Amino acid sequence: MTQANLSETLFKPRFKHPETSTLVRRFNHGAQPPVQSALDGKTIPHWYRMINRLMWIWRGIDPREILDVQARIVMSDAERTDDDLYDTVIGYRGGNWIYEWATQAMVWQQKACAEEDPQLSGRHWLHAATLYNIAAYPHLKGDDLAEQAQALSNRAYEEAAQRLPGTMRQMEFTVPGGAPITGFLHMPKGDGPFPTVLMCGGLDAMQTDYYSLYERYFAPRGIVMLTIDMPSVGFSSKWKLTQDSSLLHQHVLKALPNVPWVDHTRVAAFGFRFGANVAVRLAYLESPRLKAVACLGPVVHTLLSDFKCQQQVPEMYLDVLASRLGMHDASDEALRVELNRYSLKVQGLLGRRCPTPMLSGYWKNDPFSPEEDSRLITSSSADGKLLEIPFNPVYRNFDKGLQEITGWIEKRLC
């Protein structure tokens, strides 16, 4: 089946698909606070989703392309769930968030198919994969159209991997008590086994969102990057996120001695946002298997336990948390009680001495991850490093911060 036919088949209208903003029905909806964050983007009036321009541009999307798609959504006069929110158009049609971003992805998919140069074709496939992921954002459970966009993203990513430099292998990992999970092993040129970083991504991202991290920061250092999806999304969708948030990553770590391209004696974990919750748990529970753990904007305690902090978080992000926890109909109070159990301090881990070297990078006044969380991580480690990342200029400082973090990881692996 051709890619074009696959797209038509997946998105063929069969019934009235639920609109993304209606999937989580929390009862205590409050006023939307203005939020700006380097890793999560910012709230913009009249949009349900946070607009994450920095990360989308970092992943290779042109700023003008972002504005063009947003303009098509804004200009639509189709029926919306909420007339005040542009990105709530009902049904897979013009103006719907998933439709417009997937349509943009198909443009690049067609370019990729027409391009004779393998590397350029690979770039186009990667671009399409990124756009399909934006279409599926924020990846709420039960969002049928988003799940179809994710399937197209994974197909495009696999096509890109066949053409881009280095080698990428799709790996299947067995997890006792449930379905196996799929990860991607990104390898630089050369002979292995290689030092390896296990990527622990945020709750509103897919494992295929981190190719830029591998290409710009790990591959030049001769380091492999292994990704898996967080519980409840993508290839890990059959697994619910629980207080044992690191369960899937632990089983992957234990399987690494059987992966011939990986030097299982030189492994680090790198966590973005809630992925840092996973990475820090690994630092405590699997310290013999890890040389280092790095975190960026970690969600390990305050956001999970502090009501005032939770009040500053946008509606969409609370919906993501509720969706991952399987609490689609919960009140904010019930969600708060459950989130508190995910705090690594409440679990009795953070605050105890940890032998694993840990670095934590943070931005001042980050609504999702205050400085105190990063200090808690680094002060708990026998070899901790605290890294403040200035906010402006945001893109340059983000790049500089990642260079410093990956350099720190390299010293502990190589």
UniProtKB/Swiss-Prot annotation:
InterPro entries for the chain: AB_hydrolase_fold (IPR029058), FrsA (IPR043423), FrsA-like (IPR010520), FrsA_esterase (IPR050261)
Reaction(s) this enzyme catalyzes, per UniProt: a carboxylic ester + H2O = an alcohol + a carboxylate + H(+)
Keyword Zinc in record: no
Entry's Gene Ontology molecular function annotations: carboxylesterase activity
Enzyme Commission (EC) number: 3.1.1.1
The keyword Methyltransferase appears for this protein: no
Keywords: Hydrolase, Serine esterase
Pfam families xref list: FrsA-like (PF06500)
Signal peptide: none
Record's function text: Catalyzes the hydrolysis of esters.
Record-stated family: Belongs to the FrsA family.
Protein name, UniProt field: Esterase FrsA
Organism, scientific name: Shigella boydii serotype 4 (strain Sb227)
Lineage: Bacteria, Pseudomonadati, Pseudomonadota, Gammaproteobacteria, Enterobacterales
